[in-house]
């Protein structure tokens, strides 16, 4: 803001109607109501008028281009002095500077993010947990990168809202340094895993061989279960066919009573033999599997 002492002298063009009665000295007053001192000819765009509410007298005010846009100073007859060259010198004791205060918001409200109640049940943020394993991938997923970008955007907006209190560049530098440190740790861990001694490689090979053996055993057990089911079905079909053939032959050669008795006894013996045969088959299969596992 400029002080009044900086605005003491304002040169203007000399007027043809100005009577040069003063030689070498400043006149104590310049008759402002008369047009003998035509000092405001070049500044009509800055002229304004004001009326004293107490006395009702008319005051001439002039908006200064050197002041702020909301400031102006009021002239009276005793506010300035004129010399022979037409220069005007303001009298600070008789000049009042007025300002109109403009209401300007200095502090801005912080932007608050309002989350709705339905967003709490949104599963889009947990897709990486639902569709992937926790320890499956060491590197960050795209959803995690988007989340980091969103948090950085919120931090920058908060910094722009409070530019006088916070340093946004330091925050962004911290984010970048943290990300670079994480990437360096990941690369160092991967290089450590790659550069293992030969003993570690042999241990990993033994583990792989054990895993392949267990997988083969599971495949063989599934194959054995399928073959066992087929054998049981085939054996039952053969027994049924044999019983039907024997019953038909007995009825043809013998009477009805003898055929029924023979058929019942045959069914009992077949059921006993079937259970005995199945128990023996299961015993031999379990022993064979145990020997295969030991090998």
Curated annotation (Swiss-Prot):
It holds the Pfam family TMEM71. Keywords: Membrane, Transmembrane, Transmembrane helix. It is found in: Membrane. It is a multi-pass membrane protein. One of its GO terms (cellular component) is membrane. The chain crosses the membrane at residues 229-249, 253-273. The keyword Transport does not apply. The keyword Secreted does not apply. Belongs to the TMEM71 family. This is Transmembrane protein 71. The lineage of its organism: Eukaryota, Metazoa, Chordata, Craniata, Vertebrata.
